[in-house]
């Protein structure tokens, strides 16, 4: 009896028909592959990419030189030098360097910052040809912040209820 059932299956090509049906379903399904350099997939609002220093809407930098990010960095990739106190009692940084070679993109610096000055932005395309280009100074970080501010502000606003 089993041999008759086996013969019927092979004669009717049931496996072939089911495999062909599966192939046709996949053929007409939407593409799951992206052509990367030309198409980019969605990035989570919590994505931790290239670092940036933010400014207030009036153009003043946010960093108050509290050095919490430098203290919490497990890779010791951040170096900060604070300037003298200003007339209003606040301080600003004279030097703010991040060694991106050491950075492990943990996001602790962003979490520790009381004024949301240092953030990890949405940019993931920052490959370089030399190692020296991965040592970010204050000017580079502020330029990143100016360039990505709209997306950074949107991502922080989306994540605000969970902070």
UniProtKB/Swiss-Prot annotation:
Function: NDH-1 shuttles electrons from NADH, via FMN and iron-sulfur (Fe-S) centers, to quinones in the respiratory chain. The immediate electron acceptor for the enzyme in this species is believed to be ubiquinone. Couples the redox reaction to proton translocation (for every two electrons transferred, four hydrogen ions are translocated across the cytoplasmic membrane), and thus conserves the redox energy in a proton gradient.
GO cellular component, one term: plasma membrane
InterPro entries documented for this protein: 4Fe4S_Fe-S-bd (IPR017896), 4Fe4S_Fe_S_CS (IPR017900), NADH_quinone_OxRdtase_chainI (IPR010226)
Enzyme Commission number(s) of this protein: 7.1.1.-
Localisation per UniProt entry: Cell inner membrane
Organism, as annotated: Brucella melitensis biotype 1 (strain ATCC 23456 / CCUG 17765 / NCTC 10094 / 16M)
Family, as annotated: Belongs to the complex I 23 kDa subunit family.
Protein name, per record: NADH-quinone oxidoreductase subunit I
Higher taxonomy: Bacteria, Pseudomonadati, Pseudomonadota, Alphaproteobacteria, Hyphomicrobiales
UniProtKB keywords: 4Fe-4S, Cell inner membrane, Cell membrane, Iron, Iron-sulfur, Membrane, Metal-binding, NAD, Quinone, Repeat, Translocase, Ubiquinone
Pfam families linked to this entry: Fer4_7 (PF12838)
Membrane topology value: Peripheral membrane protein
Cofactor comment text: Binds 2 [4Fe-4S] clusters per subunit.
PROSITE patterns in the cross-refs: 4FE4S_FER_1, 4FE4S_FER_2
Enzyme class: translocase
Cofactor list: [4Fe-4S] cluster
Recorded GO MF terms: 4 iron, 4 sulfur cluster binding; iron ion binding; NADH:ubiquinone reductase (non-electrogenic) activity; quinone binding
């Amino acid at each position: 009896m089993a041999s008759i059932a086996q013969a019927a299956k092979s004669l009717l090509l049931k496996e072939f028909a089911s495999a062909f049906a599966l192939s046709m379903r996949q053929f007409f399904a939407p593409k799951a592959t992206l052509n990367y350099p030309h198409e980019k997939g969605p990035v989570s609002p919590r994505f931790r990419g290239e670092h940036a220093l933010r400014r207030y809407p009036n153009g003043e930098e946010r960093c108050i030189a509290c050095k919490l990010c430098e203290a919490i960095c497990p890779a010791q990739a951040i170096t900060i030098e604070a300037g003298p106190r200003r007339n209003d009692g606040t301080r600003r940084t004279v030097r703010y360097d991040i060694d991106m070679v050491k950075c492990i993109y943990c996001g602790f610096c962003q979490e520790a910052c009381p004024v949301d000055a240092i953030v990890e932005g949405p940019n993931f395309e920052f490959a370089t040809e030399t190692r020296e280009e991965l040592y970010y100074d204050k000017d580079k970080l502020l330029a990143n912040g100016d360039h990505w501010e709209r997306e950074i502000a949107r991502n922080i606003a989306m994540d605000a209820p969970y902070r």
